[in-house]
Amino acid sequence: MTGEDERIEMEIRKRNGKSVPFQQEKIFNAMKKAFDGQGREIGSRELNEILAAVLDNLAAAAPLTVERVQDEVERTLMERGHYEVAKAYILYREKRSALRRVRHTIARTVGDDSLDEVLRRIQMDFTEEVYSLAALQMKFESFCRPGMTEDERAEALTKAAVELTTAEAPKWEFIAARLLNHSFRCRNAQEWEGRGIGDLYGRLRYLTDKGLYGDYILAHYTHEEIAMAEGFLCPERDELFTYSGLDLLLKRYVIQSRSRVPLETPQEMFLGIALHLAMNEGSDRMGWVKRFYDMLSCMEVTMATPTMSNARKPYHQLSSCFVDTVPDSLDGIYRSLDNFAKVSKFGGGMGMYFGKVRAAGSTIRGFQGAAGGVIRWIRLVNDTAVAVDQLGMRQGAVAVYLDAWHRDLPEFLQLRTNNGDDRMKAHDVFPAVCYPDLFWRLAEENIDAPWHLMCPHEILTVKGYALEDYWGTEWEKRYLDCVNDPRIEKRSVTVKDIVRLVLRSAVETGTPFAFNRDSVNRMNPNSHTGMIYCSNLCTEIAQNMAPIEHISTEVHTENGDTVVVTATRPGEFVVCNLASLSLGNLPVEDEAYMERTVETAIRALDNVIDLNFYPLEYARLTNQKYRSIGLGVSGYHHMLAKRGIRWESEEHLAFTDAVFEHINYAAVKADAALAREKGRYALFEGSDWQTGAYFEKRGYTSEKWRALAETVAVQGMRNAYLLAVAPTSSTSILSGTSAGIDPIMKKFFLEEKKGSMLPRVAPELSMDTWWYYKAAHLIDQSWSVRAAGLRQRHIDQAQSMNLYITNDYSMRQVLRLYLEAWRVGVKTIYYVRSKALEVEDCESCSS
């Protein structure tokens, strides 16, 4: 009679007054727990006999209530001599009664009866004493003031849960998220009820009519398909959010009215993104909608911030970052400034290569000393970043790159420092230096060796070639040729002089970023069609580049009007389409699961290319030619801590090597399959993918890899570039995991935001993970560098890798980290984060 035999059909009136079918198995289970709690064994037969006696006595009771049932259980237990069990059952009832009282008190104080069910679920899911709602009630009541509205009281309740979050009680951030979500959903439901709109199709129609949703969604999907998609929604996945993640999402990511009222739920946001990304899929389109929705809503994959924010909207600029090669001409420089302004207008970040621009004191049309140098132009870039501020939301973001042999380098390295002539400063740009192998080799072997800085325009004029167009041994040969040519003016310093300027700036400002140009180009899978001069704003992108070239300006007459037509050669204007695998939320050891997840993410990124709104035609042309994407990771430290792997250990190095090799394998496999289905990228022939050099350079010699190389040679690749690890500062907060490949800053800290203190807790912090979350500034950075070197073999582009130093680091120690990174093949270094230094996170590349 455990609930299946001799079932009695009755109804029971709950405490809220509602009548529901009586479930006798609940009594059976409650009594079983009471016996188990006393350490008393009881057979199913005897327990069924007690249950039968209870049911016999209840049969005559009408109406049946919860209290009547529980009273009868107590009486029957005592009649049969089970006094200790009955006592435990009574105490259990009293405890449950106390839990109900605190729930009811909180709900009554807020003025929201529907809150009771949310609080009941919280009590069920967070059973430790440290998460008692009595503590929440006390904190909440301390915030309550006479005259507060219901919304203000609900906000105070959420604030109380936020403030209870500590390193010892980290799960309060999940409780706070549930309370915030409940308040939001109540307001959201009222918004739509007030408009008389109930279903998803109606909401999308309203948002489309108001110009808040792209009309292309309803143009591509039928009413029936939208209804099917609504069935995919899983509101319970909102419980995966931390307070910080949900608060950020509601403020920055969901669609809002023009009066800043959120009009879609988190799950509707994920579904809207999925609908957009699957829009052009074929017969199994709704299947891909569900797969995209599931990977996003389960927080296993995050798309880049522009994709999360702008997919499904009228202006759907989905790309994170752009990279431009600045030409050495007035028209070219101002075109690049214009390009940056347009990119920034739509929320993109920018990388700009200034290595072709002539140095200060160089000639212009034969006039000696006429050129002002790169600093003047970079100051214009700085002012453009400040001026084009995305409707007042935030200013533009740009990294400016210069080669280590450029004659303006010393001034460039002081752009952001606090000393010197302020007319030569640009505090709102992020400088980065492109280093050849020769520079690091000399820094390692003979730091006092001479280093010659030259003007790229003079080299081109005298030698007939652009030195920056070469890399590796060919670059070294031509560099020495220029050094030995007396016709070229040199600014001769020592390697030590440059190193000192670099390190001083890095420690003081966190920049310049480092770009190891020979390491990048040596491993470039598309070196057959060009070269890579620099990276992007966050140093994870490494793709072929070429400047936009002016061809002609002609005057025409069209329909009686005089028009001026300017023709340009589009060059290669790099675009970054990013997403990240949330390693802390994924079963990385499950190869089949990871392959399916990577396949889904690769397909979503490939679709971004065709569904994107491009701020520039140059970007669209390059993106369609190479179809480059950048799948990265977040939650790296989270992944290690969950598995009990210490950062400073050989186990860490072996684990990351295996994980990233399989991610790369899954990505290449998925991309080749996509090429078979949809076609290969235009420049596949002659690439390292096609020749097999990609696999040889990385030492992929196993049978599995050889078979994949053969498949790639036959089927091709859909995308020219695949993997790039971005910093993920914002989207890692959304998914409740650690940022990018970085170690955590602290296990727990308070962050000030708009006058209040927000708790930040390491993901899944517990006694099991506590000792594996070593703070970034306490970690021996050589372990981070070695891990980055192992990962780099499996990443065809680059990684946003930071170095964390303290005031105890000497300049020599910092230099050793740079040298070690170069030796192990790390392509780029992002910030040098000194413990006393606050640096800005990149929003655009957050994926």
Feature map (PLM): residue ranges:
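Core nucleic-acid recognition elements
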Residues: 2-8, 18, 44-271, 287-293
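Function-dense linear segments that define catalytic or interfacial modules
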Residues: 255, 261, 270-285, 289, ...
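Catalytic alpha/beta core of large soluble enzyme barrels
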Residues: 222-230, 234, 238-247, 539-543, ...
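Terminal amphipathic helices with adjacent charged low-complexity linkers/tails
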Residues: 88-95, 102, 172-204, 435, ...
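Conserved, charged catalytic cores of large soluble enzymes
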Residues: 189-283, 366-380, 392-396, 401-536, ...
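Alpha-helix capping and helix-loop boundary segments enriched in small/acidic/polar residues
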Residues: 18-22, 42-45, 110, 261-264, ...
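Short, surface-exposed, low-complexity cationic segments
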Residues: 23-41, 115-129, 271-278, 739-744
